Each structure stands twice: as C-alpha cells, then as structure tokens.
Amino acid sequence: EYAFKPIYRNLLADLMEYVKTGIKRACNEDRRKQRYIYWDLLALMRGVMSSPDAGISMLQNKIDKNTDSSAQNTDDTEEKIYTFNEPLKDLLTNDDVVPEALERVDNSDKRKFRDFIKTLNDIKAADSDEKVRQALDIVRFSLNSGMNPIVFCQYIQTAEYVGKYIVEH
C-alpha cells in the first residue's frame, strides 16, 4: 500500500479537472466523436497514472501529433478518429504502447500538457513516485526470498521506467 506524494496527488487532481472539462466539451459532439473523446481521455489518464515516462510520452505525442496534423485535411482526421474506435479495438494486441493522439487540441490544451510534462519530470527528479518505490520494495523482498520476480506493466515506457529505477536503486 502506498500514498501519493502531494506533487503527484495535485497532478492527478489537475488531470481529473482536464478530463471533466473534456467530457463536458464532448457533450456537444455526435456520438461517434464523443466515444473517441472518452477513449482518448481514458487513455490519457491511464498513461499518466501508469508512470511519469508513459505520461510524458503520451502527452508529448498529443502535442506533436496535433502540431503535425494541422496541415491534414479534416476528412483524413475524421477517418482516423473513427477507425481508431472500431468495436474490435480492445482486441488489438499492441495495447503495450502509448496510444497516439488523434484529436486536435488548442494552444491552451498544449500549454496544459506542457505543464503536466514539467510536473511529471519534477516527480521523477524528486524521486516522488511512490508506486515505483513500492515496486522496488516488492522486487527486493522477492529477490531476498530467493524468488525471480517478473514485473508486468501496461506500457513499454512504464516497463522501461520501472526496470531502470530498480537497476539504479
């Protein structure tokens, strides 16, 4: 059992506010786009909560994708949005990579994403990620008990982050 440090707790509270705002905005869209927006917001929460590295990667992908996609035409973007939400999406085997962003975001969202990234970097720099520290304690206990632990992570970025943390500590 672990408790989030204040910096992480505040980040998650800010993220939840962003998600609530996104859900309110989605109410004005058609059902297909609403569904996409909900999946996108859920993926964002999962990424940020998985690890600082997964969150940073996802947020940076959203910023970069939206910068690159500004030149694309609307039909191409809409086609990608709806393809992303095929009913079989959950059966895909590559749920271990951070999803790419398909929704266009405005400059205020980009600023917010950059603020989230800065906070996630601050969490890493201050060693304020209690979840990875708890994982380290469990791995140490397992190793000291003669076991060979395997740590499963949802995202590749999280697996690399946890692996690096364990090796360094």
Which role does the model predict for each range below?
Residues 1-169:
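Helicase motor interdomain insertion/brace
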